[in-house]
Design a protein with these regions (language model features):
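A detector of single, family-specific signature residues
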Residues: 1-185
Length: 185
């Protein structure tokens, strides 16, 4: 960041743009200025997203390894019409974490669903990896699954489904609270 601030304050000779070194200096100053503008805009938007998530789903942020970006993606996935998601399995299918049978002969296996909202699936993956790094229960769960003969990726697929179930329950309870407040007022 210090280098970027130095580049922004630099004063290249704008009349010597035909020289390669000066053209580089001019471009670097322009890129550094644009970087700082975008950095400031991202910071402002992160603050807005955090405020929105805190208002709409404070319980979601309290979950392990769920940050504001992942929580906001969950809210975007559910949308303004949560009634369309009748069960946690429909939510899992929407997120692309419902199991798809991929059996062959004697092997009974499931693979990850490649459909659904890929951004929601990515957010679930970030949460799963965060929990795998920091949560002892999650580490034990994955170790147990690997001990049962599953690969680590299959164990993570199961973990993503579990997290999806947990988040669906939180969001459904949130919607019930919002609806009960609207009915009473």
């Amino acid at each position: 960041m210090q280098l970027i601030r130095i580049l922004v304050t630099s004063k290249p000779d704008m009349t010597r743009y035909r020289h390669v070194e000066d053209a580089y200096r001019i471009s670097l100053k322009s890129l550094a200025r644009r970087y700082l503008e975008l950095h400031d805009e991202i910071s402002e938007l992160d603050i807005m997203i955090a405020a929105i998530v805190d208002d709409l789903a404070p319980d979601l942020i309290k979950c392990k390894a769920v940050g504001y970006e992942c929580a906001s993606q969950r809210l975007i996935t559910v949308g303004d019409n949560p009634e369309r998601l009748r069960s946690e399995s429909s939510f899992a299918a929407l997120c692309g974490v419902s199991p798809v049978p991929a059996s062959s002969g004697k092997n009974q296996r499931h693979r990850l669903n490649r459909g659904g909202d890929r951004a929601a699936n990515s957010a679930l993956h970030i949460i799963a990896i965060g929990r795998l790094r920091t949560d002892a229960k999650t580490q034990e769960y994955v170790a147990r699954r690997v001990g049962e003969g599953h690969s680590k990726l299959e164990a993570i697929r199961c973990l993503k489904r579990y997290i999806s179930r947990e988040i669906f329950t939180l969001l459904r309870n949130r919607d019930r609270q919002i609806n009960s407040v609207q009915i009473t007022t």
